[in-house]
Amino acid sequence: MKTLSDISESVLIPTNSSLDKLLGGGIEKGCITQFYGPPGSGKTNIALKILYEATKNGSKAIYMDTEGGLSLERIQQIAGTDFGSISKNIYILEPKSFDEQILDIQNIEDILKKDKSIDMLIIDSIVALYRVEDGDPSEINKRLGRLMAKLLRLSREYNVAIVITNQIYSPFDSDDLIIEPIGGTVLKYWSKIIIEIEKSVDSLKRTATLQRHKTKAPGQSIKFEIIDRGII
């Protein structure tokens, strides 16, 4: 047991982009931050920008690519002359099934125990393999819930920031104007910070809207742009 005075303030990892205005300064350690949106909205670009910012000063990160879309060229473009140094600070995991994803996350704890310089875990995306899993939907949802509970425990116990990207869908009983993040209440429950990413008419502009935050009111939004060096 500890007293309130023993609890330290949250540590933030800046994204050095306009997203920091929504996030209160950056990605928070000790919790899960979720970015969700349609294909092509910029979720992976956000993830890679965060990856670069988390590792450029010598800290390490784990990047889990579940979609097979990790682009070395894009990371090089974002990192520029820092690529050589940050490449040594990034662990890459590429599970090919939901079972492999769960196993990899279980094994991440061993990595965190051995390497105390890891500050960030990014999963892009959290649901790609979950969506194609065969079996009883209720049981698969339970497994997703256990996976998320494991991630939250790791974030708190090892004081790492966890970022997940998520996809969207339109419920069958709604019109196309209503979209929901996949994973429903499971991902919403375990994600303490949630940001929706939307495309704009201008293909270079995106809108990020705060849907959930530990200390800030939802509904705030900012515009950002995808550029060679990530996002601004």
Swiss-Prot record:
Function, in words: Involved in DNA repair and in homologous recombination. May regulate the cleavage reactions of the branch-structured DNA. Has a very weak ATPase activity that is not stimulated by DNA. Binds DNA but does not promote DNA strands exchange.
GO annotation terms (biological process): DNA recombination; DNA repair
NCBIfam families reported for this sequence: recomb_radB (TIGR02237)
Organism: Methanosphaera stadtmanae (strain ATCC 43021 / DSM 3091 / JCM 11832 / MCB-3)
Disulphide bridges: none
Protein name: DNA repair and recombination protein RadB
InterPro entries cross-referenced by the UniProt entry: AAA+_ATPase, DNA_recomb/repair_Rad51_C, DNA_recomb/repair_RecA, DNA_repair_and_recomb_RadB, P-loop_NTPase, RecA_ATP-bd
Superkingdom classification of source: Archaea
